[in-house]
Amino acid sequence: MATPGYDYDRDIPAGFYDEIHQCKAGVRFFWHDLKFRAVAKRLDGVGKVLDVGCGPGTFIGNYLGGVECLGIDFSASQIDYANRRYGTAEHRFSTQMLASLGERFDAITMIELLEHLPPADARRLLAEARGLLSPQGRLVVTTPNYRSLWPLIEWGVNRVSRVSYEQQHINKYWRGRLAADLAQAGYAKVEVGTAVGLAPFAAVFGRGPAQWLDAVERSVGHLGCGNLLVAVARP
């Protein structure tokens, strides 16, 4: 399941997003850091996590210490990178497909994945993941919120970045549509919120301003208009 006409192994080098994270500063770092923190917060207390579309392993390696994790991705080069940098007995990375795992998980994450898939493939993936959750498990999904400032941000990124979201993002969600797809996939309890407002852009002035603005935005729940949707769904 890949974006038609887009070659991830060719256009996104192994470790590309992890190298952004290693900088620990700047707009792009804070964007991904706030996103990962929003997901990790929703995994509090879980015992075993599957990260679908894990890329170079940044989320597992930096935010899920002490948690048994498996990260999977179709890109062999990204998985090779993840194993070299973050692989341990506790943190495993593989190119296995969902159907071949044969394991149950307390939580499954899909971080910035669904927007890259054709709608039918995305719905099928959500349904397959439900079958791998433990009875009390949870699925945590993030995807851009196309009823926020995200379309404007995406337009700008497409003109200054080596990565073209115009080519990558073929499946566009808003709160109601994501909730509907999760319900259609068989999830009984679905909550969709938002995260990541304008705080990352304050990072041009330093870490302090970005952290301050993030605290303000979180205190008002991003007014429901954060640039990312964050859904928690239970089987």
Annotated model-derived regions:
Residues 58-61, 148-151, 199-202:
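Short catalytic/ligand-binding loop motif for oxyanion handling, primarily in non-cytosolic enzymes
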Residues 161-177:
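Acceptor-substrate binding/catalytic loop of class I
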Residues 69, 189-190:
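Hydrophobic anchor at the start of a short beta-strand
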